[in-house]
């Protein structure tokens, strides 16, 4: 459930199909995101999941799986 919502957020920001977004995909190299795209994705995640991702944690997000892990951690706090 969380992964599908994450896929939708990323797909909307990057104009991709959700099924092209895998846990192993890197935002920059695989999905073609730039720093503004990543910022928009993080903002979308925070809004959709009603969480806050600290800046130091956001800087560690390289793959879609990293973002999913941050969501999981924030929801379990």
Regions found by a protein language model. Name each.
Residues 9, 44-48, 70:
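Structural preference for long, well-ordered alpha-helical segments within the folded cores
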Residues 1-19, 74-77:
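Thiotemplate assembly-line natural product biosynthesis machinery
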Residues 52-54, 58-76:
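C-terminal structural segments of small proteins and small subunits
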Residues 29-47, 66:
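Phosphopantetheine-attachment site and its flanking helix in carrier
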Residues 7-10, 32, 38-39, 58:
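Alpha-helical structural signal
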Residues 1, 6, 26, 44, ...:
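Residue-level recognition of oxygen-bearing side chains
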Residues 25, 40-43, 59, 76-77:
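Short, structured secondary-structure boundary patches
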Residues 14-32, 48-57:
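Phosphopantetheine carrier-protein modules
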């Amino acid at each position: 459930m969380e992964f599908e919502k994450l896929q939708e957020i990323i797909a909307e920001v990057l104009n991709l199909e959700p099924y092209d977004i895998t846990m192993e995909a890197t935002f920059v190299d695989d999905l073609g995101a730039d720093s503004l795209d990543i910022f928009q994705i993080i903002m979308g995640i925070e809004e959709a999941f009603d969480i806050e991702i600290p800046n130091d944690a956001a800087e560690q997000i390289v793959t879609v799986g990293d973002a999913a892990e941050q969501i999981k951690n924030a929801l379990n706090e």
